[in-house]
């Protein structure tokens, strides 16, 4: 189980390195982690089993499940093929797997029957421990007239914390039959419960310019629904989506894009899901064009990871001290929320000299490309 950050105070961290040539240097915090061009957060809503049987092994590497006829008369499986994984790099020679989020209803997570269509608790835990985000989607996915929205929000937080030991801090409004404006009640109650973001019907995005500070602190954002047409595989519809992403890559500003679907197996569950062949084509195309195999400008990361990076970026202050070839960079972050899971930052170093790290007050691993492109340092705040 990954342990969450528990500090809630100003954090001062030092990174010291030595230049190989005497030159003047400067440094700034990258707009996006690893200095990528586009952050793409893709969420699988409702906690369907295909997140673990299909999406996870495709992205992380492993055997994708063969067809699994399930209790909904659908199919929670894929093509049964072995995947080597889909990756981008951290800009310093290390590869990072594509990761998604699951919007979870804890009240409908179960281990039986064998042909279940939903995730089990052990599967949710595995996804979380592999760096996927688990988002609050309400305890029972209720939206109809008479729903106690506050109870739905809080019960889901409490039950997931009880079962797995972490606190969900991102909310996704559940869809379905509803009263007009019900989403605003969910938004209000989610923020009151400590959520930092809410995915709703209307808000920022789905493509958000993050070249400037992210405002407001409590972010309501919209997402694109990606779904197949009935049970007919159409790769041309995925090509249209890829063209949309390509246009975002051409933006002069860094972009954070949010999209979602439901099931990712072999059947189009509720006609609001993405058939596995289309899901696979989308993800492998992203890898080949914008991941490690392509131009490596894509940060394929889930909502919480991206939001927390942007928060850290907007609240961090850096100072640089240089004495000849010796450089010290101090990074200060005040009032780091105790529920933050990710405290990573990327520094863009403007230097005409290669460099090597000498010392750091950070307890986490630091990566840099000081001996090659000499322009990036990745680290996490204590």
Regions found by a protein language model. Name each.
Residues 75-80, 227-250:
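A Trp-anchored, charged/polar loop motif used as the substrate-binding/catalytic surface
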Residues 1-7:
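C-terminal segment of classical bacterial N-terminal signal peptides
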Residues 13-32, 194-211, 256-339, 343-370:
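C-terminal domain-boundary segment and adjacent tail
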């Amino acid at each position: 189980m990954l342990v969450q950050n528990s500090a809630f105070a100003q954090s001062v961290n030092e990174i010291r390195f030595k230049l190989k040539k005497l030159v003047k240097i400067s440094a700034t915090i990258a707009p996006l982690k690893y200095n990528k061009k586009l952050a793409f957060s893709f969420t699988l809503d409702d906690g369907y089993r295909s997140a673990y049987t299909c999406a996870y092994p495709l992205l992380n590497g492993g055997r994708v499940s063969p067809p699994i006829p399930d209790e909904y008369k659908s199919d929670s499986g894929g093509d049964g093929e072995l995947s080597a994984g889909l990756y981008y790099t951290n800009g310093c020679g290390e590869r990072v797997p594509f990761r998604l989020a699951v919007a979870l209803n804890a009240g409908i997570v179960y281990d039986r029957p064998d042909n279940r269509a939903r995730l089990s608790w052990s599967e949710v835990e595995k996804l979380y421990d592999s760096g996927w985000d688990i988002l609050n989607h309400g305890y029972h996915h209720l939206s109809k007239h008479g729903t106690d929205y506050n109870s739905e929000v809080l019960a889901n937080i409490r039950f997931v914390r009880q079962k797995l030991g972490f606190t969900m801090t991102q909310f996704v409004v559940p869809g379905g039959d509803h009263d007009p404006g019900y989403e605003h009640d969910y938004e209000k109650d989610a923020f009151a419960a400590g959520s930092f973001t809410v995915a709703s019907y209307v808000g920022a995005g789905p493509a958000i310019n993050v070249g400037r500070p992210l405002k407001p602190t409590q972010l309501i954002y919209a997402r694109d629904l990606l779904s197949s047409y009935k049970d007919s595989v159409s790769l041309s519809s995925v090509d249209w989506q890829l063209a949309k992403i390509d246009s975002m890559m051409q933006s002069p500003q860094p972009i954070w894009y949010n999209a979602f679907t439901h099931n990712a197996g072999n059947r189009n569950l509720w006609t609001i899901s993405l058939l596995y062949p289309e899901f696979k084509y989308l993800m492998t195309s992203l890898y080949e064009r914008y991941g490690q195999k392509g131009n490596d400008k894509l940060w394929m990361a889930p909502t919480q990871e991206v939001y927390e990076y942007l928060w850290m970026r907007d609240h961090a202050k850096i100072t640089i001290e240089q004495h000849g070839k010796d450089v010290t960079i101090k990074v200060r972050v005040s009032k780091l929320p105790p529920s933050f899971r990710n405290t990573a930052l990327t520094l863009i170093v403007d230097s005409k000299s290669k460099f090597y790290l000498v010392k750091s007050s950070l307890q986490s691993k630091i990566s840099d490309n000081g001996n090659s492109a000499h322009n990036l340092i990745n680290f996490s705040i204590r």
